[in-house]
Amino acid sequence: MTMPPPRPPRILVKRLAHAEGLALPAYQTAGAAGLDLAAALPHGTTLVLEPGGRHLLPTGFCLEIPEGYEAQVRPRSGLARKHGVTVLNTPGTIDADYRGEIGVILINMGDEPFEIVRGTRIAQLVVAPCVQAELIETHTLSDTERGEDGFGSTGHGSHQ
């Protein structure tokens, strides 16, 4: 007997005045993991993100994320591939107790200026369960095959 999928969390969304007329963040396909976030720039404004430049962009929305969940602001792959534009602090974590406007820090790693206007989809928001761990201080840790090796220590190249 298969169990029905768990009910997705409900997130309350507060629309700020500068987001009037913009669509709510939304999944673009039935299988999408992320809700698209759009720039809530003033009408008629074009923001030019120069190569190497970064800017904090408003989305015009605040969220009430349920306890036990978080949201991550992540890059849109098309912006990165086509223009070299990505989210600087990726992933940007939105905690369940944060109630301010969702902002997106974009950086242009490309060679050309990138223009952003009101409604440009600039990032995606992925909601996921999270837990707070209990840390217990100790003088020793259990041994593993890997041990203290890190940063590329598990190998290089292909697995042939």
Curated annotation (Swiss-Prot):
Region (Disordered) location: 139-160
Biased composition (Gly residues): 150-160
Keywords from the named record: Hydrolase, Magnesium, Metal-binding, Nucleotide metabolism
Required co-factors: Mg(2+)
SUPFAM superfamilies reported in the protein's UniProt record: dUTPase-like (SSF51283)
One Pfam family here: dUTPase
Record's compositionally biased regions (Basic and acidic residues): 139-149
Keyword Metal-binding: yes
GO process terms (BP): dUMP biosynthetic process; dUTP catabolic process
Family membership noted in the UniProt record: Belongs to the dUTPase family.
Known role: This enzyme is involved in nucleotide metabolism: it produces dUMP, the immediate precursor of thymidine nucleotides and it decreases the intracellular concentration of dUTP so that uracil cannot be incorporated into DNA.
NCBIfam families: dut, PRK00601.1
Name of protein: Deoxyuridine 5'-triphosphate nucleotidohydrolase
Gene source species: Beijerinckia indica subsp. indica (strain ATCC 9039 / DSM 1715 / NCIMB 8712)
